[in-house]
Amino acid sequence: MHRARDYRMPLREITTAVLVDGGFYRKRAAALLGKKDPEQRAAELLAYCRRHIRESRAGLYRIFYYDCPPLDKVVYHPLTKEQVNLGKSEQFEWMTRFLKALTRKRKVAVRRGEKLETQGNYILKDKPLKRLCSGSLRVEDLCEDDFVLDITQKGVDMRIGLDIASLAQQKLVNQIVMIAGDSDFVPAAKLARRSGIDFILDPMWASVTDSLNEHIDGVRECVTNRPESLNDPLHVNNMAKELEPDNVDDEM
């Protein structure tokens, strides 16, 4: 009696790298999961990335976090007509503590861009600017919260592209999860897919352009959109029921 041969290809084990555009993640996480202190946000980021690992039933290669160091310049505020020392601001302290907390996390690599550059100008946020132009807001009614510092990131997109290319060429992973919202990394994503890597985008419910959709293998969010995200265990009101000790090594 001859046994039938099983010609099915064995399923390959999935090894995943999670790449996080820091500026994008911080903005979307604050909108979906609430504002948190630096240490809470760092722990939340790890827990959120673990969700992707569990969804893929994968092993984690590493979490790459990309951001720029906080700005410490002295700039002029047009409303108060005062010089503002950004190095002594709450945002500077928050970012410094946040990046420090991330560097202490297991399997997290923090990739810093160049020092943030600015023209030294505060600009009006979109909402008060529209109200001002429509006449529903008067100049004398403007407040400090209506302004935001005009900041340009440098070096972050380049580092993301280099890491994607390195992961693909050295065959270190067979899946990449990219938490981002723009299309600047599309050329690197195309290279990764040509190398056989499953490329997943997590835009955290931000809109995705057609050109970006064309060059990824799928979209997956690991958080519900508002208002359902208010019930998420990672929401600040629920005090992060999913957070685990850093030494927990499941899939890590």
Task: State what each model feature region is.
Residues 11, 112, 116-252:
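Nuclease catalytic cores that cleave nucleic-acid phosphodiester bonds
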